[in-house]
Amino acid sequence: MLDKIPGQITCEDFKYFVRTISERAPAKRGISVRALEKFINTHKLQSHSVEDFISAVILPQTGNGKCSFASLFAEHVDKGPAAVPPVGAVTHFVCLSNTRKPPFSLVVAALVELEKQLFSADTENLSTGAAMYVWLDMLCLNLHEVTHRATDQPPRRAWEMEDHNIIADQVIEQAQEFVLFLDNWQNPTVFSDGPCLCELFFAQVSK
């Protein structure tokens, strides 16, 4: 999402992004990973990268309402008699870092596998239709607010961001899983992107 902000990404942009997440992370609404997997398969989006998914699916679908994709997700999923509700109370908070190029289907597959591992020892949960609902930043944030800030906003004062480390720590503490995506060493994008370095740093120091 950060690369969608017009112009060069600055530390202030990253701080704004972190603060936006911290303000909305406790939201109760999450998306079922199984419903998300079904959505991707139904619409043949397996080859879409995270970046493609945002630009081709999320932004167009939410353009009129200027809302999060999670707000509209239930309308785009077929509801069978045995289907898990596509939207429910959050069970896991997930924040993606540096996953713009890999297929989004791989991210979802990893979450589906995590759900299987969590419920593997609890057959009762599986039989009763229990599901993992994730608060996934790209799906549950209003990307129109995050990526297109008003240009007439007054500049933020320095003291407003002094609590940045505290806010970032709170965001990381809410995350229950971290997934590391390795980049091609011949083109190590992650090491040339300041915000990515910040995210990796916070993930490490908060372990």
Where in this protein do the model-derived segments appear?
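The feature represents the membrane-entry module of six-transmembrane cation channels
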Residues: 1-207
